[in-house]
């Protein structure tokens, strides 16, 4: 059986623990699922120069920041959403996915600030209490600690959440403040979006089930 191929889209920085944890969490899932995984970091600016089907056999992880150029990362988010590739988004990419829908479907006609800036500063982690509300979230947290770590906190305008929930996303978990923390795209259930960083709490003995779910989606693609 051929190896699972995963493109990690982001600007790798050895000084950021979240970037190291991204690599390690894939190693954890590879060992747990007994599947070979080949993963590669690709800068967002490089992705936009790829040929249309160059990543056809890949899964994509839209990695946490910081990003050297937010414009290129936003473009990468758009490309992935409009592709047929299974994807995982963690950290700052949460903001960019929401922003994509707001702009693509004109969900903010008054041009108000409907999603806050990141409320966590620097290379630090805050804890967040996850409360599963959807089937995927309930399944994930039936076997995993509901305390997660995050370097990103965004507050989304409640009315926008309702519009997104009605037409565009399945909310799978909130936090203790009832802010959305985990969702999947309604028309692409193989795209998982987490505001927090599940890779941080993944270990070799207990790989994070969100990472496992993403890897399984990539595996299904290789078997088609």
Which residues fall in each region the model found?
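N-terminal beta1-alpha1 cap of cysteine-dependent amidohydrolase-like domains
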Residues: 1-145, 150-187, 195-224
């Amino acid at each position: 059986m051929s190896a699972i191929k995963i493109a990690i889209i982001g600007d790798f920085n050895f000084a950021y623990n979240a970037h190291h944890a991204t690599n390690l969490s894939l190693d954890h899932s590879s060992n747990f699922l007994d599947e070979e995984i080949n993963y590669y970091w690709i800068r967002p600016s490089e992705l936009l120069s790829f040929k249309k089907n160059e990543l056809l056999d890949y899964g994509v992880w839209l990695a946490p920041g910081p990003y050297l150029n937010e414009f290129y990362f936003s473009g990468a988010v758009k490309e992935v959403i409009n592709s047929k590739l299974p994807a995982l988004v963690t950290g700052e990419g949460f903001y960019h996915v929401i922003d994509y829908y707001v702009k693509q479907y004109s969900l903010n006609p008054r041009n108000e600030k409907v999603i806050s800036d990141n409320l966590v500063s620097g290379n630090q982690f805050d804890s967040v209490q996850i409360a599963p509300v959807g089937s995927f979230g309930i399944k994930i947290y039936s076997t995993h600690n509901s305390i997660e770590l995050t370097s990103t906190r965004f507050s989304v305008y409640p009315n926008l959440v309702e519009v997104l929930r009605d037409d565009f996303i399945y909310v799978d978990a909130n936090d203790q403040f009832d802010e959305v923390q985990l969702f999947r795209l309604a028309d692409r259930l193989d795209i998982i979006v987490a505001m927090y960083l599940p890779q941080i709490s993944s270990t070799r003995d207990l790989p994070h089930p969100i990472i496992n779910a993403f890897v399984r989606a990539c595996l299904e693609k290789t078997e088609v």
